Amino acid sequence: MAATMFRATLRGWRTGVQRGCGLRLLSQTQGPPDYPRFVESVDEYQFVERLLPATRIPDPPKHEHYPTPSGWQPPRDPPPNLPYFVRRSRMHNIPVYKDITHGNRQMTVIRKVEGDIWALQKDVEDFLSPLLGKTPVTQVNEVTGTLRIKGYFDQELKAWLLEKGF
């Protein structure tokens, strides 16, 4: 870097014009520009608050009758007395999802299981066995609280969990 600066100085000495020095000298001699003052107003902050994301999802409104036209149904007020509990998602839906991997492996996933997940697995197998004619293939992950079932049974399992009171 020092060599390039030296060459540039020599070039400027030969031609009589020094390059790059004028801007540096100007920037060092001038003070900071005078910016206009600002006024802090709290009246318009309501418009800023509308843009900020909500910190939590609000509770769903009360309806006259259930299920609602969208098919949503609240959980039973006293939770069912079972050794396991399936917590609702943050949007207040039952956490049963379809999953497809490797292009054709169809799975149904029940998430947010708390408590005895093995009891839930046994109850799910008892529920799905008459529908399939055989015991479904399941996978339990105790750490993440998920139960995976081979095949698409999301609608049946959602209805079954609603019937149980989750």
UniProtKB/Swiss-Prot annotation:
GO biological process per UniProt: mitochondrial translation
Annotated tissue distribution: Ubiquitous.
Presence of keyword NAD: no
This protein's record includes keyword Ribonucleoprotein: yes
Family according to the record: Belongs to the mitochondrion-specific ribosomal protein mL49 family.
Subunit annotation: Component of the mitochondrial large ribosomal subunit (mt-LSU). Mature mammalian 55S mitochondrial ribosomes consist of a small (28S) and a large (39S) subunit. The 28S small subunit contains a 12S ribosomal RNA (12S mt-rRNA) and 30 different proteins. The 39S large subunit contains a 16S rRNA (16S mt-rRNA), a copy of mitochondrial valine transfer RNA (mt-tRNA(Val)), which plays an integral structural role, and 52 different proteins. Interacts with OXA1L.
Designated name of the protein: Large ribosomal subunit protein mL49
Source species: Homo sapiens (Human)
Lineage: Eukaryota, Metazoa, Chordata, Craniata, Vertebrata
